[in-house]
Regions:
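Surface-exposed acidic, glycine-flexible loop patches that form ligand/cofactor-binding
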Residues: 54-65, 79-81, 90-91
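Second-shell loop/turn segments in exported
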Residues: 17-19, 33-42, 74-79, 100, ...
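Phosphate/oxyanion-binding active-site loops and adjacent basic polyanion-contact surfaces
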Residues: 41-49
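Von Willebrand factor
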Residues: 1-22, 49-52, 68-72, 101-108
Length: 143
């Protein structure tokens, strides 16, 4: 399991709204690191998911081991329509790659993302640290 963040503001040095934070390794590392993130920026969820699935597919090809993309989101600012997103996910997602989504808060959910995910859970109150940890830990496959 690896961890990226997204919704990063774009600048001269940040040309995409996402970046890796935790290299592939134990799921517990993801569960711990995600607790350090804040919220903000524009949630470029769809482009970030496509990039992460492509990266996970590369990881599977290199390692021969399955990979899981865990998305923790508060919502989606659509940067591609449903048909383009579905096609991009299909093209980026290789064999052995799973997608787990945890939606935090009461913001509008991305119905297309929910359809494409292998697992999808919601934590209504993002200030509930116990519920957050439980959902994210389960999504990451940590024990």
């Amino acid at each position: 399991v690896g961890l990226w963040n997204y919704s990063s503001p774009l600048s001269a040095t940040a040309t995409v709204g996402y970046r890796p934070n935790v290299a592939y390794g134990e799921a517990d590392n993801v569960a711990q690191a995600v607790g350090l993130f804040g919220t903000g920026g524009v949630p470029q969820t769809r482009s970030a998911v496509v990039a992460a699935l492509g990266n996970a597919s590369d990881q599977v090809a290199e390692s021969g081991k399955d990979a899981r993309v865990v998305l923790v989101t508060t919502g989606t600012q659509q940067d591609m329509d449903d048909a383009a997103f579905t096609e991009a996910v299909k093209n980026a997602r290789g064999e052995g790659v799973s997608l787990s989504v945890v939606h935090l808060g009461t913001g509008e959910k991305d119905a297309e993302l929910e359809k494409l995910a292998d697992s999808y859970s919601t934590v209504s109150d993002p200030s509930d640290a116990t519920a957050n940890k439980k959902s994210i830990t389960a999504a990451a496959g940590a024990q």
